[in-house]
Amino acid sequence: MTIWIDPPAWPAHGRLWSHLVSDSSFEELHAFAATAGIPRRGFEGDHYDVPEERYAALVAAGARPVAGRELVRRLHASGLRIPKRRHERVLLSHPAPPWLPPGSRADVIASRQDSPPANTVVVRLLAHAVGSVLVVPRGDGGVDLPSRALGAETGHRAVEEALRQVQSATVGSPAAADLVGYVRNTVPEPDSDYPWPAPRACFAVFARAVEPDARHGDGQWLSLNEAADHLGERHWWPLVPEFFSHPGRHRATP
């Protein structure tokens, strides 16, 4: 069980950065970072980004220096590497989620890509207006964001069609909606009750700003606090506060 760090060589925000990883567990990595005074906001899903001025202190605290390529190799070998695309950030990772078969993982990934991964199976619509979000009733008496499953067809066109359908049913005419991010299930050994493709299936969230009176059917508007009370335990929920905390990253307007 070792903490590894590569040389500060990655430019961002006017300085150079190193990557800090564990080859055994995220718990070990978080514990080391906390002891060293590295804030949790520096965690990027499978590593910490640390500024160059902290490099020497982290090595002195026990992190072992290694070249960048070797660090990536060790992270891959540990099984802790979380794949993501450019302009994506891992918000949360569940290494053994109780709602999935044993040996699975669920990652919540914020994205600035134009479209979700090809293995997307469900789209959800984050329709928002004046700090409120639109929700619809679920069969169990709760509420959810409006959603559509893609069915047998997948890929970009199927995502567009599902997004068109969910908008038509809830907010009227379809319009531009921006990808906020997605939850990715990684299930190497699905059991007979697992309903989604394996080994990977993605559940995407798209955002669209609408007028406050843009509501069809049985949807209702909830404030962000009310929505958090009802939906805060849903696996995709971290994408919602991430969206509202960085609204300039998303282009769609009413």
Where are these regions (language model features)?
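Short, compact, well-ordered microdomains
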Residues: 45-84
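Acidic, metal-coordinating catalytic segment for phosphate/diphosphate chemistry
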Residues: 72, 80-123
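The feature represents the first ordered module of a protein
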Residues: 1-25
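A short, exposed loop/beta-hairpin motif centered on an aromatic-Gly-Thr core
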Residues: 41-47, 148-151
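Active-site-adjacent beta-strand/loop module that shapes the phosphate/pyrophosphate-binding cleft
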Residues: 180-217
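Nudix hydrolase/Nudix homology domain
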Residues: 94, 139-143, 209-254
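Conserved Nudix-box catalytic region and its N-terminal flanking loop in Nudix hydrolases
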Residues: 122, 128-167
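A short, structured beta-strand/loop element
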Residues: 23-43
